């Protein structure tokens, strides 16, 4: 069940789900479609480089099966090795959004990755592309390493979110840099979406308990034994973590503290 009373706001849009789901690596298109439905996500990200921009192509027939009146497309620039390449992908992403009936959609998940082995984002290329796209009116969601200073620079440029990685893309290693993620979250005045590396619902919960505003994942669902079930589990994990964060964790204590009252108890002799 979505929490409509605690919306995620990105740019001028509000979303009831704080889970974003990718569309790659699924065994079948049916798995992708059913997982998206089961996750109850509002935002679906699509790698533009890996798709033709013609919505009538058979290669992206699964996109036509999704309800774009309920879902919001987040085109991503995955595969871009330079800022210039990412900028071109962003404009192609907007064209695809228009073909899906979302003419007002200028969202882009900005990825500039020049390293083919470790797939770590290029901070210089990301800054360069972000500055250009923000000036062109795009709602930019940059994928970055867990670098607190870079996050602040991107916020200053006008990015709508920052998306620090939990661990390398597709690794399933979970949250490897909790300290830096916490610093980014504490200092940001824009939403922080933890992106990449999450492999289990408990890790999605942990990200939300830290205070992240949302989680984006793909491989953890797509490559699980039961993608639909994992999508539902991730949905619950994100909601649980968010509610726990809002409720506030109890203070840790050095010594044990009884949970039952110890005063005003009659002694029985």
From Swiss-Prot:
UniProt main location, coarse: plastid
Binding site for 1-deoxy-D-xylulose 5-phosphate: 170, 196-197, 218-219
Membrane-spanning segments: none
Gene3D superfamilies, sorted: Aldolase class I (3.20.20.70)
InterPro entries, alphabetized: Aldolase_TIM, Thiazole_synthase_ThiG, ThiG
Pathway: Cofactor biosynthesis; thiamine diphosphate biosynthesis
GO-annotated cellular components: 2-iminoacetate synthase complex; chloroplast
Methyltransferase is among the record's keywords: no
Main enzyme class: transferase
Subunit structure: Homotetramer. Forms heterodimers with either ThiH or ThiS.
Task performed by this protein: Catalyzes the rearrangement of 1-deoxy-D-xylulose 5-phosphate (DXP) to produce the thiazole phosphate moiety of thiamine. Sulfur is provided by the thiocarboxylate moiety of the carrier protein ThiS. In vitro, sulfur can be provided by H(2)S.
Record's protein name: Thiazole synthase
